[in-house]
Amino acid sequence: MQAELLVRMINQIADFYGSGSEADVAAQETLMHVKRMWADRMRRQMVEIGPADPGLGPVARRAVELLVATDAPSRVAG
């Protein structure tokens, strides 16, 4: 899947959870959605894209930071 599409998707998810929530709560909810709903391949690609992608909004960026922190060890082991 193209990086731009994944970035757009995670931004949309973050926007949804960010409406009416604190940024940290919204980032956690975004992360949980991604872990529940995205295929392993999509999560691995998002980890490779990383939180430095300039297209990420603040909540999405934090969610990707959390994703990298939680998914990176399984990437190495798998």
Segments (PLM) and residue ranges:
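Intrinsically disordered, low-complexity, basic-enriched segments
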Residues: 1-32, 36-78
